[in-house]
């Protein structure tokens, strides 16, 4: 069933903030995510608290990114993703509320890790974001494993 859901839909987004505040729900999800990460040694994780919570202690991560985008640009992009089915004003309000609640959440609030690479997505297009990420990944992996490092 979950494979047929659009996890980035407004309907799902409306419930995420409420669920993210529930300590027990976060614990269950964290255990599930850590299990998947242990099973797959090379994995790319995406989420608002992957580096600060899920990967914080063990297993360690090679590269972490913290994406920052101004509310106006983020709202427009989300509105286009939703095929303009919801008023832009509502999308903007929803994003503002979710970000504020995530940052002020008692358990594992949204924050940038000290070693995370900040990427300002409001001033870059997708291609530029990917190029910047790729450059940072190469730099970190070469620094950690040496110039002869080759991904499997």
Where are these regions (language model features)?
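NTP-dependent small-molecule kinase module
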Residues: 3-8, 13, 76-84, 101-152
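Conserved catalytic network of the ASCE P-loop NTPase/AAA+ motor domain
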Residues: 34-38, 54-59, 108-112
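ATP-dependent small-molecule kinase phosphotransfer cores
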Residues: 1-43, 49, 72, 76, ...
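Short, well-ordered beta-strand core segments
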Residues: 43, 61-66, 116-118
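Conserved phosphate-donor/acceptor-positioning beta-strand/loop module used by diverse small-molecule
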Residues: 58-80, 93-96
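Amphipathic alpha-helical interaction elements
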Residues: 17, 21, 66, 80-84
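Anionic group-transfer/hydrolysis microenvironments
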Residues: 48, 68-70, 122
């Amino acid at each position: 069933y979950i494979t047929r859901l659009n996890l980035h839909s407004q309907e799902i987004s409306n419930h995420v903030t409420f669920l993210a505040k529930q300590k027990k729900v976060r614990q269950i999800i964290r255990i599930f995510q850590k299990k998947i990460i242990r099973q797959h040694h090379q994995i790319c994780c995406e989420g608002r608290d992957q580096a600060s919570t899920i990967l914080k202690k063990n297993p360690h991560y090679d590269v972490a990114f913290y994406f920052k985008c101004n509310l106006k640009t983020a709202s427009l992009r989300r509105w286009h993703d939703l095929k303009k089915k919801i008023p832009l004003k509502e999308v903007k309000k929803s994003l503002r509320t979710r970000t504020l609640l995530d940052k002020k959440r008692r358990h594992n609030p949204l924050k940038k890790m000290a070693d995370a690479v900040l990427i300002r997505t409001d001033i870059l297009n997708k291609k530029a974001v990917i190029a910047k990420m790729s450059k940072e990944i190469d730099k970190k992996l070469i620094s950690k494993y040496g110039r002869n490092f080759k991904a499997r």
